[in-house]
């Protein structure tokens, strides 16, 4: 699997999603503000051939990463060869301490 590259626009959208989750007190792939992650990406002008999203709530990046890698579905997104770009968002203030959003796209 090739390393993922950071995408600036995807980083902005992932950060917005994390902030939206804290502000509106939810933990879901579907935002009451923006809809699905795929709808949200399109609203912000991000085009893709394939896309995915991981969410984690944890006190540290290390613990969040470990929990994502120990989850089959989340691990598949991280290691998915069709994804070549990532955006990561982090927001503080949730019941978990921090919310982590990983958005993946393949172009």
Positions of PLM-derived features:
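Loop/turn elements at helix/coil->beta-strand transitions in domains of secreted/extracellular proteins
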Residues: 1-2, 46, 51, 83-86, ...
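Intrinsically disordered, low-complexity
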Residues: 1-12, 95-96, 107
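Intrinsically disordered, low-complexity N-terminal regions enriched in serine/proline/glycine
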Residues: 5, 25-26, 99, 103
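Short, surface-exposed glycine/acidic/tryptophan-bearing loops
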Residues: 9-64, 78
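Disulfide-stabilized extracellular recognition modules
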Residues: 56-107
């Amino acid at each position: 699997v090739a390393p993922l590259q950071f995408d600036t626009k995807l980083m902005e959208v992932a950060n917005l999603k994390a902030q939206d989750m804290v502000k509106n007190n939810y933990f879901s792939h579907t935002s009451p503000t923006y809809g699905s992650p795929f709808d949200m990406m399109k609203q912000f002008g991000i085009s893709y051939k394939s896309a995915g999203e991981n969410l984690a709530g944890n006190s540290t990046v290390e613990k969040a990463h470990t929990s994502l890698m120990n989850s089959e579905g989340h691990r598949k997104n991280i290691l998915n060869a069709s994804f070549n770009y990532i955006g990561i968002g982090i927001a503080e203030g949730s019941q978990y301490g921090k919310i982590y959003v990983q958005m993946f796209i393949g172009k």
